[in-house]
Amino acid sequence: MESRALLAVALWFCVETRAASVGLPGDSLHPPKLSTQKDILTILANTTLQITCRGQRDLDWLWPNTPRDSEERVLVTECGDSIFCKTLTVPRVVGNDTGAYKCFYRDTDVSSIVYVYVQDHRSPFIASVSDEHGIVYITENKNKTVVIPCRGSISNLNVSLCARYPEKRFVPDGNRISWDSEKGFTIPSYMISYAGMVFCEAKINDETYQSIMYIVLVVGYRIYDVVLSPPHEIELSAGEKLVLNCTARTELNVGLDFSWQFPSSKHQHKKIVNRDVKSLPGTVAKMFLSTLTIDSVTKSDQGEYTCTAYSGLMTKKNKTFVRVHTKPFIAFGSGMKSLVEATVGSQVRIPVKYLSYPAPDIKWYRNGRPIESNYTMIVGDELTIMEVSERDAGNYTVILTNPISMEKQSHMVSLVVNVPPQIGEKALISPMDSYQYGTMQTLTCTVYANPPLHHIQWYWQLEEACSYRPSQTNPYTCKEWRHVKDFQGGNKIEVTKNQYALIEGKNKTVSTLVIQAAYVSALYKCEAINKAGRGERVISFHVIRGPEITVQPATQPTERESMSLLCTADRNTFENLTWYKLGSQATSVHMGESLTPVCKNLDALWKLNGTVFSNSTNDILIVAFQNASLQDQGNYVCSAQDKKTKKRHCLVKQLVILERMAPMITGNLENQTTTIGETIEVVCPTSGNPTPLITWFKDNETLVEDSGIVLKDGNRNLTIRRVRKEDGGLYTCQACNVLGCARAETLFIIEGVQEKTNLEVIILVGTAVIAMFFWLLLVILVRTVKRANEGELKTGYLSIVMDPDELPLDERCERLPYDASKWEFPRDRLKLGKPLGRGAFGQVIEADAFGIDKTATCKTVAVKMLKEGATHSEHRALMSELKILIHIGHHLNVVNLLGACTKPGGPLMVIVEFCKFGNLSTYLRGKRNEFVPYKSKGARFRSGKDYVGELSVDLKRRLDSITSSQSSASSGFVEEKSLSDVEEEEASEELYKDFLTLEHLICYSFQVAKGMEFLASRKCIHRDLAARNILLSEKNVVKICDFGLARDIYKDPDYVRKGDPRLPLKWMAPETIFDRIYTIQSGVWSFGVLLWEIFSLGASPYPGVKIDEKFCRRLKEGTRMRAPDYTTPEMYQTMLDCWHEDPNQRPAFSELVEHLGNLLQANAQQDGKDYIVLPMSETLSMEEDSGLSLPTSPVSCMEEEEVCDPKFHYDNTAGISHYLQNSKRKSRPVSVKTFEDIPLEEPEVKVIPDDSQTDSGMVLASEELKTLEDRNKLSPSFGGMMPSKSRESVASEGSNQTSGYQSGYHSDDTDTTVYSSDEAGLLKLVDVAGHVDSGTTLRSSPV
């Protein structure tokens, strides 16, 4: 029992002690107890002050604000007899030690205070460091008091305040003027506002003592406003710098204090700078600025930021919100429309809703062409079209580009412009035309509308039943309209019909109303309706019995032309023919709502003089217009009197005269490209009065109609049938009238080859013979000249180098031979084209080589050469690279040497193979939308599993047969077997039109391994193996290349500056980074990174990881990349094996070739099995050993956390077991620590150019690198490195913009490269492997 009681007591004591130590209350928390019980303690100077404080938890002391050199005199020690006890000791105290001494619990406000007076009669006033350099700020406010901080070391002094100048003394009055030894002298501020300085004075034993002088500054207090800049909500990405400016505007003589409140106020990287801003001349305000800076924000910095300005009497604040994003992003918001409909003439707005940081660059395209703002369109966050027309209809694409990550998002909106029905006759037919009695008449209504019409209807009404108001747009108003089918009381309608016709390039509806006989004057209305609106036309069908009016000439009159109006009447029926012009003021005379006929008001009309001609039956009255003008337009009335009834009959004719207009071509003539034998048709739309005469020219020569050239529609339409090569050229359409001419040009490009005539062949042969003669003569002359080979060789320019273990560095390049008789190629047979890559001192150019290959006349090649001003060392480096390429020899999966131009008389040029599809990284990124991981069922060339089985057996056999024996150096001109032999066995297909499958990725990996195995067999080390240095040729063949001379690595984010050279750190093995060791096995590490690039479809390695010293350390400690999005467990295991920390444990390239070949064969044997994307947990539980099930990508794992785990934890499958059994290496661990397991900070992206660096990202394993310090022994700063961007697309795109080849370069060359028979077999198998799985051929547009 006794032991239990002791145990209980001990437990209670531990609990209480723990509660006190962590700040948790036990029963209660009492203030600390001091050794003195007094609140005020008085001691003499030069004595020792010692106070002990005891409490219930950790204690600490605060004492008066003393100078820094006296802080060493204050001792705080632990008591020996208690846990929570501290003693404060101040030896030899002085007057300035007077003040409050505080003992308190840490992290709480619970404390005990004692005020200590150190009486020193020689220095009764305390000179405290808190006196702010003897300045007292006051405001002229009668209600405000100011405290002069002249505190005393003696509590009962008799103190007065002296002010000067003028001098004045103030003594305490017990009211508003007082002195307190703990605070100082208190006085109303207005009493000393006049003074320049003040001080306190006291008398002790007839001795007068003074405090320090205090300068009096009269200040204001009003704060007008506080403004934050930027004023709106701030968005930043993690790692970026935050700068907030807080500007306060106050009255003059204001002292201001700033304070900031924000989420991470204890941020160690924050910096606050306060300063005055110089006020503008003439202003009565003062400006203060406080700047808050956080160099690298994190997610914890997100929140509300408040700036507070305090002047002593006034406080003002302003706030803003700072939003911190994990990384730059961009996405379209919800609600983006894909279809917008508008009515012609209206204003259209197409807004863009997006979520992005930072604000994106916005580009608009219409039907693939960029749009710029003009007077009809405004582009920006929304597209605004002022008055939309039909021409504006089309597909509008908005492309958003994130300026940091360069990620792009696009959205297409189709704009449909609806056109309400437009009736063409409205502007052409006068509403006052008249029709002869009893005649058959046809009324037409030509309607254009979009979308098509719902219907067209005809209505009619008697003329007397409607009112006429000429001032209105539609002058006729009828209370009701009758359908034409109800013609009771009107004219009989024979038929109505609708037809469709192509008029002026538009599909229009022509509605026709046939009136059997014109007996009754009436109004006819044509009404058309579609979804956009309605249109109508009212026709005045005025029936007369009398004269007829005609216009001569019959064509539409134009100003400054001569024309005549003829009024013809039967001479036996009518007499007194007279012409009148109907003025605007006398168009008609109204009687209420009824219309008085024109003939009843002829006296109000303007009578015209005319000439009368007569024939046997008619009288004709003619009014002639010489040089007609626009003023001659109007309504003309011909009046004739009936001889029997004396009744006048009037006929009205509207005369329209067109304004003269210079010719104009109203549309654009676009260039056209076609092939031989096709038909070209182009329309030249014109306008002008008089009607222009159209003439066509070809290459400035008049074009006339021929058997294949047809001109129609007044020469507007030009058609060329069965085009020939000579039909290509510049075609000009010229439209002329009396006012001038207008021209428009278009270019016809004719592609294809047509058979040449015998004469052409003879000319070509003769020219070739003459050229060959001069070429031989030039060769004889040039061969007599020798060029020097002296100078130092700067091996740092090379990337594919000899193995340093095989030969000393200074001898290995010099001893390599160059056989000019085998490799020299004449410069005059090389036609240089467009540049493919350009660096600091080198460049690669596309060229046509004539006669470099005996199988063709012309072959497209790539030429490596130096830029102007290259040094002798750079010239030697390129020459050494040429020798290395000769030494390496020929291989299908290496960009092979074809020839060189080394003789004097021109630049040094190295000619290599041209790969038309560019580098593999760019190609894979462009094919992400066409990636199909599974096979479609069925075979491509023949159906059933027989073919697949045959292929798989033959595939493995022939892959094994292709060895590095092909490596013997051959001529630069001829090989044993042409690739055309292989093309005869298979159909040639465009590479960019095939879907990308998992089998393609394995095939590419296998080919690169074959190429690296070959380079290793030739004792060569490639020190920049990456997807940007893998080129893609025809038929899915990949080739290892190095365009070190043509890549500007100063601007390439994949190359990080480390010391003197720039290095591709993401691809380098740890031993290369730290020890500058380049071996075949360090190339295996780079091959593993290349596999990651391939199975991520061109992403940049280590996405989101800052490439710095920390990255290198983690890499050396075993942290590796996560599995790429499109890989299999087997391929990821292969990558991990390549990344083994021990170089000797990494697989050899020969082992990788065997393993990847087995995977490729296993892939071909799947016999119709589709690949299914499974969660990793399901994938790893499968017992199949094919190795072809795809894991879920880490992205999808994040979306479905319950189903899969984004980390790879699995045992090696059977598919890789054989590969490991035959290896000397150990298997990788079942789990891998990846960079996703480690929190990452978003780096600030910046590029540091340095012209002093070498041009190549692939540096030699030379003495130059051996001088660099050993990274294992030293730990230098990696500050000179360029951090990678947080978005993988930025780095990957940036790294490939300067690569040797760019995708999209196409060659007209129809010839093929010559390969050995073994390589031709490999080429065939590679191509079949790329196509056998597709079943039905799937194609897409070229990237």
UniProtKB/Swiss-Prot annotation:
Residues 830-1158 form the Protein kinase domain. Present in an inactive conformation in the absence of bound ligand. Binding of VEGFA, VEGFC or VEGFD leads to dimerization and activation by autophosphorylation on tyrosine residues. May be regulated by hydrogen sulfide (H(2)S) levels via a sensitive intracellular disulfide bond. Disulfide bonds join C53-C103, C150-C200, C246-C307, C445-C526, C567-C638, C684-C733, C1020-C1041. The chain crosses the membrane at residues 761-781. The keyword Cytoplasm applies. Residues 1267-1314 are annotated as: Disordered. The record marks Y1171 as: Interaction with SHB. It holds the Pfam family I-set. The keyword Hydrolase does not apply. The modification Phosphoserine is found at S978, S980, S1227, S1231. GO terms for biological process: angiogenesis; blood vessel endothelial cell differentiation; branching involved in blood vessel morphogenesis; branching morphogenesis of an epithelial tube; calcium ion homeostasis; cell fate commitment; cell migration; cell migration involved in sprouting angiogenesis. The active site is at D1024. GO terms for molecular function: ATP binding; cadherin binding; coreceptor activity; growth factor binding; identical protein binding; integrin binding; protein tyrosine kinase activity; vascular endothelial growth factor binding. Residues 1292-1305 have a biased composition (Polar residues). Expressed in the post-pubertal mammary glands. Tyrosine-protein kinase that acts as a cell-surface receptor for VEGFA, VEGFC and VEGFD. Plays an essential role in the regulation of angiogenesis, vascular development, vascular permeability, and embryonic hematopoiesis. Promotes proliferation, survival, migration and differentiation of endothelial cells. Promotes reorganization of the actin cytoskeleton. Isoforms lacking a transmembrane domain may function as decoy receptors for VEGFA, VEGFC and/or VEGFD. Modulates FLT1 and FLT4 signaling by forming heterodimers. This is Vascular endothelial growth factor receptor 2.
